[in-house]
Design a protein with these regions (language model features):
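Short acidic/polar N-terminal linker immediately downstream of export determinants
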Residues: 4-7, 20-88, 107-127, 142, ...
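Sec-dependent N-terminal signal peptides
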Residues: 7-13
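Short, surface-exposed interaction patches in beta-rich subdomains
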Residues: 46-49, 164-165, 169-173, 178-267
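A structural signal for short hydrophobic beta-strand segments in well-ordered beta-sheet cores
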Residues: 61, 91-93, 256
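Hydrophobic residues embedded in beta-strands of well-ordered beta-sheets
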Residues: 78, 98-101, 263
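Mid-chain, structured segments of secreted extracytoplasmic proteins
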Residues: 90-110
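Right-handed parallel beta-helix
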Residues: 133-175, 179
């Protein structure tokens, strides 16, 4: 009976989540200027932008439909390169006080698919260690080896990968797709809200609390042996499997709420 209930809930939740366009960046399908025309006079073009951010302490990115990679480089400017989809309206950059904003918008069309995503590479100066905020619609998002202050990610439809990053706090809301978080150095407080898809977390040096609200799918969380954490888990229709060896110090708290799926914590 419990398995039957899980299946019913999975179908209901998946339908509900994938239909929530506002959360997942596909609300434009309901817009009055959404087009189902299979033809387009637009052609793809290259983007090559560069801007000094020496006086910036926060970068915000509002990305509509793109496969996006964000990395450090040894220059002093933010550099944005890549190829825009034929449906893209382009990339705009703007400075407002100490905030630098990057916006990519896409023409609304029923023909958008993986072959119509823009391909963007954003290089951030290695000297930048401020805040990063990303509001992501459709595509993939990959961040590698950044050292930041506060990180906020709102993902839509697609995979999210944060590899080798360090931060004082991370707030990640996933939509539909997989999430991968790998840290090697210091990390602060972490909040992850699961959507539909797998979540894989591998933590290095732990220096903060973790709160995980599971959605639909499995989660695997790897922590160091004898990590100074106290793990609390709450299961709804899902299952939790806590088998990590931790210390008795309990300096930080991991609060895990299992949605429809499973959560495993291991070394």
């Amino acid at each position: 009976m419990k398995n039957v209930l899980k299946i019913i809930m999975a179908l209901s939740l998946t339908t509900m989540l994938t239909s929530c366009g506002i959360s997942f960046g596909v609300d434009s399908r309901r817009s009055s200027n959404w087009s189902s025309d299979s033809s387009s006079s637009l052609t793809s073009e290259e983007v090559n932008l560069s801007e000094d951010i020496s006086d910036i302490n926060k970068i915000t990115m509002k990305i509509d439909v793109s496969d996006l990679n964000v990395i450090y480089h040894d220059g002093s400017n933010v550099e944005i390169t890549g190829e825009l989809s034929s449906y893209s309206k382009g990339v705009d950059i703007n400075k407002s006080g100490s905030t630098f904003e990057i916006v990519e918008e896409t023409t609304q069309s029923m023909n958008l698919g993986p072959n119509n995503y823009s391909e963007l590479l954003i290089k951030i100066p290695r000297s930048f260690n401020g805040d990063l905020k990303l509001d992501f619609g459709v595509g993939s998002f990959n961040v590698s080896d950044l050292v930041l202050n506060n990180v906020e990610v709102k993902a839509g439809v697609g995979d999210v990968s944060l590899d080798g990053i360090s931060f004082n706090s991370l707030d990640l809301e996933s939509g539909v797709g997989s999430v991968s978080l790998v840290t090697k150095e210091k990390t602060g407080d972490i909040y992850i809200s699961g959507g539909v898809g797998e979540v894989n977390v591998e933590l290095g040096d732990i220096n903060g609390n973790l709160k995980f609200d599971g959605g639909v799918g499995s989660a695997d969380i790897k922590v160091p042996v004898d990590a100074p954490i106290n793990i609390n888990s709450k299961s709804g229709l899902g299952d939790s499997n806590i088998k990590a060896k931790t210390s008795n110090e309990g300096k930080y708290t991991f609060d895990l709420e299992v949605g429809l799926g499973s959560v495993t914590v291991r070394n």
